[in-house]
Amino acid sequence: MKVLVIQNRMGIGDMVIFLPFIEAISKKLKTPVSILVKESSKSREFLNDNKNISEIIDLERDNKNKGKHDGFFGSLKLIKELKDYKFDKAFIFNSSLRFFVICKLARIKKVYQYPLFEKKNQHIIKAAQEFLNKKIKLDVESKPEINLDINKINEAKQKYNFSSSKINILLGIGGSGKTKRIPAETFIKFIDHCNNFKDCRFFLATGNHEEELEILNKILGSANGGKCEKLNHLKINE
């Protein structure tokens, strides 16, 4: 059986939120699944070691409607590409009629999807839970875990000189949109609070958008900025 899961939200955090649901589908159907995701989700950088995912297919369509899968002719290209995979089932984690039609025209026999046209005020986690419970009787808890190769973990420890005498904390300070970004002051208060109790070292993970760099620089310029290391120049798997 060949199974496709479509998760078209753009952020890394979005991908992490949906990961337990994708893994639950794989375990329920007893087969690794292929996922159709945007490049901005960075799935290729942190899901390559996931045994529940067999292939990562790029959805080349961003929030500005650019890319080879955008528009009418882009949809035709995507239909052709998906048809070649010969998928038996598809799970669509959104309420878009577009993806339902694409899956049907790609000759996918069984297509499961959120109720159409119900995107407004849709709770990202509850909608996914209700979807899988209703369609395939799955109860899934929202407890994402990212499984990494132990060798990569040991390499990172050596590269960044992790010390057992310090608490190493990774902070995701970026965001894929303005409404998803937390002010620098919130992180600064957290960093100051932690350092009042323990000797900590902070790694600041973010992108390179202007707003994200502004948050990064404010944190680095704070009282405990010297205990922070920026990671915006690295990929997730680095």
Question: Model regions: which residues?
Answer:
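Catalytic machinery of carbohydrate-active enzymes
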Residues: 1-238
